[in-house]
């Protein structure tokens, strides 16, 4: 079993990254086809073996810098060896709403008969009608396969699990279990919640769950981790655009304030666009006082602040900011200003590099980031500003529109003095 994490908590965007959760490409990405990739939120199919090599390189480069990397398939394999954990997952995943009333017993029995490693792979990679052996196939499953085809899914794959940033957010001393925006991603949170609830690496750690519950219908409230940045000094940045809704932002702020976990939430109103689906696609920290931004979007952000107070019923005071977003962030950190590196190249190159996650950097310590190799203009500008840019291959990993920041969920990160 993996060693227990003695401590969890993310206290900045740039402090030394100690522990991080990732999810390697696998069966879910082998299930991507030209006919289903759009529904599964990928722009194209992947060359999966190359994606695995590039992701392994990404993990290796973080480990070389002293980061402990936790991998989701491994954690889930170990989690389902606990009978209580397996029951908890299957009770919630194998339901009439998910697989159909006639398939619950058969699909559950088939999954329970798998070895832990294979079970974890299918929980993330999905179950096709053809996966369940013919001798065990019921009349209902046979009709399902004959009508919809052998490549139809009893349980859909979760290829976006690779972007571990989104399903949960470690904010200071606690975590959120995020209700995701698109149906293709909503089942991811259940698996992450199971790991946090049952895996020894987390059961031995003390933390609060600030917001989110896989057993609850959150309605119009959606929250994704690419929009959430605990930056220090009790401040949390939250993007509000395509993926994160105002309903979730208010509830998250309310929960953080009620437990004294944060003093201020700065909300970044974003355009509703896939290119800027999360705040971290247009804005990320690369050093304690340096950010990289896509100005076409960041200059249009509508910033406002939530603080404890105001209406006694809700405990939140709201204020529209009269300064640009970057200036508001600098002021919140006690800085006169932030150094800004814009997406590089001319207008055409900048738009391309933003699309290819040029602003989606993950900081592994102050002034050291990991990003995609293809964003040569932006990487060069960051290096000229004194940032060490460690590059990884991008041709396959980027097909789901996520870079180094998206592919990492920090679990333990040091604070930064401001």
Curated annotation (Swiss-Prot):
- Return the similarity comment: Belongs to the arginine deiminase family.
EC category name? hydrolase
Record-listed E.C. numbers: 3.5.3.6
Active site residues according to the UniProt entry: 406 (amidino-cysteine intermediate)
| Pathway involvement of the protein, from the record | Amino-acid degradation; L-arginine degradation via ADI pathway; carbamoyl phosphate from L-arginine: step 1/2
Q: Which PANTHER family match?
A: ARGININE DEIMINASE (PTHR47271:SF3)
Would the keyword Cytoplasm be found if you checked this record's keyword annotation? yes
Q: From the UniProt record, list the reaction(s) this protein catalyses.
A: L-arginine + H2O = L-citrulline + NH4(+)
One Pfam annotation reads: ADI
Q: What is this protein called?
A: Arginine deiminase
**Keyword Hydrolase assigned:** yes
Q: Please indicate which superkingdom the organism of origin belongs to.
A: Bacteria
Which species does this protein come from?
A: Burkholderia mallei (strain ATCC 23344)
Q: Choose any GO biological process term that the UniProt entry carries and state it.
A: arginine catabolic process to ornithine
Keywords from UniProt, A to Z, are: Arginine metabolism, Cytoplasm, Hydrolase
Q: GO MF terms on file?
A: arginine deiminase activity
Question: What is the annotated localization of this protein?
Answer: Cytoplasm
Entry's HAMAP family?
Answer: Arg_deiminase
Gene Ontology, cellular component aspect: cytoplasm
